[in-house]
């Protein structure tokens, strides 16, 4: 039974994409895009986060290029938000979180700034007249504060004034830097962004994870030595969980395959390890995290022996898994990846997709019942594009540039 690149399956994906786009519209607040609750309501107590606002700018840039009425207005809103309350006019960059009363968290976070870069680059593909100016400014901030020429890797965070940085390096922030760098390359055609993405992947995946059974280290010191016991006392941390976060392993795999395709599109020979390590990450994620306790679903985190730590099933790992399955199938034509893709969609429609309240549940417990141990509410809709839109596109260019170029369903029959 074939789903990939069939018009019938792609039509179903498109219907679900529109349902998600419509849910996300509820996130509009004066300061950007807010944190969505389980029924699509704004959770005002959470404030307006840079990472959510930037991700929603990215999402509605894709929607605008798909011809969705009203989406361009949301792109405009997102750009104004990025130039508004979230932006630090004194020291530069963006605050981590604001609300209607002012700044809630003035720190300058790499993770959040890389989403600012992704959102700005995606907005450029819509033709918005202010998007390129926003991208140029964001690149300036990244170059000055978050890309380390000495380390050839990305820094984690700064204080408000960009005067002190952490003695910590994060795999999560660097992974999302790779994601953003790929899209920046697509809109600027500056090869250095691909070179940087390749460098980051080579350190975190090829040098470290490959030699550890593809269990990806998330936490490093400033010399890029893994810190294996980081947050052992706070294992369910949303952004810096203890141990391995298998959803990131499989997400890394997809990003490396986009990088592989981007290099091929330049008529360059990609390093063979990009594909081989992507396969290794995919299978390691299934080995350690899929149904280890008997019930279907990906556990949130595992220890260094692959045993579950936080058994909750958060939605984004399985969403990323489906995108990676498609990417691996595209490059290998191996039917096992489509079989996993279909199995995971069956799981999602059974447990995660919420047709009563909208969007998808963010988190399930070990028995696949709705819970809120790690996440509260449905936040945003960014990850969902990776199982809804990416399976309808070639692997290069990246998501927003490919949609803007009219490449949706180009291979569908």
From Swiss-Prot:
GO biological process entries: 6-sulfoquinovose(1-) catabolic process to glycerone phosphate and 3-sulfolactaldehyde; carbohydrate metabolic process
Protein name as annotated: Sulfoquinovose isomerase
Family: Belongs to the N-acylglucosamine 2-epimerase family.
Gene Ontology molecular function: sulfoquinovose isomerase activity
Subunit structure: Homohexamer.
Keyword Isomerase in record: yes
EC supergroup of this enzyme: isomerase
The enzyme's E.C. designation: 5.3.1.31
SUPFAM superfamilies to which the protein is assigned, alphabetical: Six-hairpin glycosidases
Keyword Phosphoprotein set for record: no
Residues engaged in binding 6-sulfo-beta-D-quinovose: 55, 111, 172, 176, 238, 251, 362, 379, 383
Reaction(s) the record says it catalyses: 6-sulfo-beta-D-quinovose = 6-deoxy-6-sulfo-D-fructose; 6-sulfo-beta-D-quinovose = 6-sulfo-D-rhamnose
Function: Catalyzes the isomerization of sulfoquinovose (SQ) to 6-deoxy-6-sulfo-D-fructose (SF). Can also catalyze the interconversion of SQ and sulforhamnose (SR). In vitro, can also catalyze the interconversion of mannose, fructose and glucose, but has extremely low activity with glucose.
Gene (UniProt): yihS
Cited InterPro entries: 6-hairpin_glycosidase_sf, 6hp_glycosidase-like_sf, AGE/CE, AGE_dom, SQ_isomerase
UniProt keyword annotations, A-Z: Carbohydrate metabolism, Isomerase
Family annotation (HAMAP family): SQ_isomerase
Active site, per annotation: 248, 383
PANTHER family from the UniProt entry: N-ACYLGLUCOSAMINE-2-EPIMERASE
């Amino acid at each position: 039974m074939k789903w990939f690149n069939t018009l019938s399956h792609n039509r179903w994906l498109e219907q679900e994409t529109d349902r998600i786009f419509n849910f996300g519209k509820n996130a509009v607040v004066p300061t950007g895009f807010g944190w969505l609750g389980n029924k699509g309501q704004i959770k005002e107590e959470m404030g307006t986060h840079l990472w959510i606002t930037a991700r929603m700018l990215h999402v509605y840039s894709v929607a605008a290029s798909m011809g969705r009425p009203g989406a361009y207005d949301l792109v405009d809103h997102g750009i104004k938000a990025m130039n508004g309350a979230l932006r630090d006019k004194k020291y530069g960059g963006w605050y981590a979180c604001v609300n209607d009363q002012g700044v809630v968290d003035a720190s300058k976070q790499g993770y959040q700034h890389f989403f600012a870069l992704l959102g700005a680059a995606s907005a450029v593909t819509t033709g918005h007249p202010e998007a390129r100016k926003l991208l140029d400014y964001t690149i300036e901030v990244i170059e000055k504060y978050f890309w380390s020429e000495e380390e050839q890797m990305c820094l984690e965070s700064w204080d408000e004034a960009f005067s002190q940085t952490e003695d910590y390096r994060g795999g999560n922030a660097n992974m999302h830097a790779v994601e953003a760098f790929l899209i920046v390359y697509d809109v600027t055609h500056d090869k250095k962004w691909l070179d940087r993405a390749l460098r980051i992947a080579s350190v975190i995946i090829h040098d470290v994870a490959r030699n550890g059974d593809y269990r990806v280290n998330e936490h490093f010191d400033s010399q890029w030595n893994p810190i294996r016991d980081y947050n052992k006392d706070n294992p369910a941390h949303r952004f810096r969980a203890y141990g391995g976060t298998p959803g990131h392993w499989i997400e890394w795999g997809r990003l490396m395959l986009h990088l592989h395709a981007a290099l091929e599109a330049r008529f360059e020979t990609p390093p063979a390890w990009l594909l081989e390590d992507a396969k290794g990450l995919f299978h390691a994620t299934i080995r350690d995290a899929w149904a280890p306790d008997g019930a279907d679903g990906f556990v949130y985190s595992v220890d260094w022996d692959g045993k579950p730590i936080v058994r909750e099933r958060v939605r984004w790992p399985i969403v990323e898994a489906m995108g990676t399955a498609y990417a691996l199938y595209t490059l290998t034509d191996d039917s096992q990846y489509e079989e996993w893709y279909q199995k995971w969609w069956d799981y999602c429609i059974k447990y995660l997709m919420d047709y009563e309240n909208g969007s998808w549940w963010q988190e399930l417990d070990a028995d696949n019942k709705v819970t809120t141990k790690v996440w509260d509410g449905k936040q945003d809709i960014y990850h969902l594009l990776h199982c809804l839109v990416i399976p309808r596109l070639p692997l290069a260019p990246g998501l927003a540039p490919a949609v803007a170029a009219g490449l949706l369903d180009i291979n569908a029959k």
